[in-house]
């Protein structure tokens, strides 16, 4: 039987359908239903949210397929799941389960310290993290259909997501201003594939959607990332590590949609209870910084 992979246009189109929305991490059917009722456009099924992965340490792997199937059976919105960077078999297992997207994620412990997956070989579209134009372009060349900032997952601290979004957007503007004969040197210096840079220059933007992720903890955080140019928002630990997950979920969805309505964001932020406990980035050891994973 011939293995028919999804075309690049179809995969990118599927990701475009999530634009402007919020994607929430969930660990069971109950949380998935809360996310769907709050207006999430998709959920990410995993065993532990990033804050718990960070706290537990050790090796973090793909979720038990039972959890993924439980979440898939509980909601009608798309379901994503994470595999380790470079783990061919975890990705194939998730594809066989019928997930809607796979996140080749630095939140999990990398399986390969040299190679990312060739995502063009799969029918299912992939999501990947990036901090700059080099990482973004390499993931696109490998076949990623959606990007997200890496931020610093599980910290409840938005500063790294802001840094990464600003960095990528500044470099897009730089690429757009370069002559085509200057792009090859830029490609060499950044490790960005030349053909992807040409596409970015032609479009004046990335050819795939770029969501914010890694540290979104409040409605204001979500609105901030949208104002900085994010196409949507991933919320990992920020929902179910907060004092009132259902209220936080609804408020973050509304703030993402109405990110320039400050009176509404103020109203949404009232009486929410405590957000997740945050971590100052400077207190993390180099080996604790998940954003450093991937290349």
UniProtKB/Swiss-Prot annotation:
Active site: 82
Recorded catalytic activity of this chain's protein: aldehydo-D-ribose 5-phosphate + D-glyceraldehyde 3-phosphate + L-glutamine = pyridoxal 5'-phosphate + L-glutamate + phosphate + 3 H2O + H(+)
BP terms from Gene Ontology: amino acid metabolic process; pyridoxal phosphate biosynthetic process; pyridoxine biosynthetic process
Any one GO molecular-function label of the UniProt entry: pyridoxal 5'-phosphate synthase (glutamine hydrolysing) activity
InterPro entries: Aldolase_TIM, PdxS/SNZ, PdxS/SNZ_N, RibuloseP-bd_barrel
Pfam families: SOR_SNZ
Pathway: Cofactor biosynthesis; pyridoxal 5'-phosphate biosynthesis
Alphabetical keyword list: Lyase, Pyridoxal phosphate, Schiff base
EC number: 4.3.3.6
Binding site for D-ribose 5-phosphate: 25, 154, 215, 236-237
Residues engaged in binding D-glyceraldehyde 3-phosphate: 166
Family: Belongs to the PdxS/SNZ family.
Free-text function comment from the UniProt entry: Catalyzes the formation of pyridoxal 5'-phosphate from ribose 5-phosphate (RBP), glyceraldehyde 3-phosphate (G3P) and ammonia. The ammonia is provided by the PdxT subunit. Can also use ribulose 5-phosphate and dihydroxyacetone phosphate as substrates, resulting from enzyme-catalyzed isomerization of RBP and G3P, respectively.
Assembly mode: In the presence of PdxT, forms a dodecamer of heterodimers.
Protein name: Pyridoxal 5'-phosphate synthase subunit PdxS
């Amino acid at each position: 039987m011939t293995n028919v992979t999804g075309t690049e246009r179809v995969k990118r189109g599927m990701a475009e359908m999530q634009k402007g929305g919020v994607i929430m991490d969930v660990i069971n059917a109950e949380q998935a239903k809360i996310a769907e009722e709050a207006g999430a456009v998709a959920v990410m099924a995993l065993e532990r949210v990033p804050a718990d992965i960070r706290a537990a340490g050790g090796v973090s792997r793909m979720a038990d397929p039972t959890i993924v199937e439980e979440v898939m059976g509980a909601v009608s919105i798309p379901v994503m799941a994470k595999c380790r960077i470079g783990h061919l078999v975890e990705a194939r297992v998730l594809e066989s389960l019928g997930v809607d997207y796979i996140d080749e994620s630095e939140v999990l412990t990398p399986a390969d310290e040299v190679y990312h997956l060739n995502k063009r070989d799969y029918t299912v579209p992939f999501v990947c993290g990036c901090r700059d134009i080099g990482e973004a372009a390499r993931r696109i060349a490998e076949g990623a259909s959606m990007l997200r900032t890496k931020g610093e997952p599980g910290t409840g601290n938005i500063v790294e997501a802001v840094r990464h979004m600003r960095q990528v957007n500044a470099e897009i503007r730089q690429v757009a201003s370069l002559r085509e004969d200057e792009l090859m040197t830029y490609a060499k210096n950044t490790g960005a594939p030349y053909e992807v840079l040409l596409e970015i220059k032609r479009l004046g933007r990335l050819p795939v959607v770029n969501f914010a992720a890694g540290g979104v903890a409040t409605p204001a955080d979500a609105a901030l990332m949208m104002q900085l140019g994010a196409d949507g928002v991933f919320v990992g630990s920020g929902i179910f590590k907060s004092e009132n997950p259902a209220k936080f979920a609804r408020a973050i969805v509304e703030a993402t949609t109405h990110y320039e309505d400050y009176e509404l964001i103020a109203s949404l932020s009232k009486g929410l209870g405590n957000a997740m406990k945050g971590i100052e980035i400077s207190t993390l050891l180099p080996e604790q910084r998940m954003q450093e994973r991937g290349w």
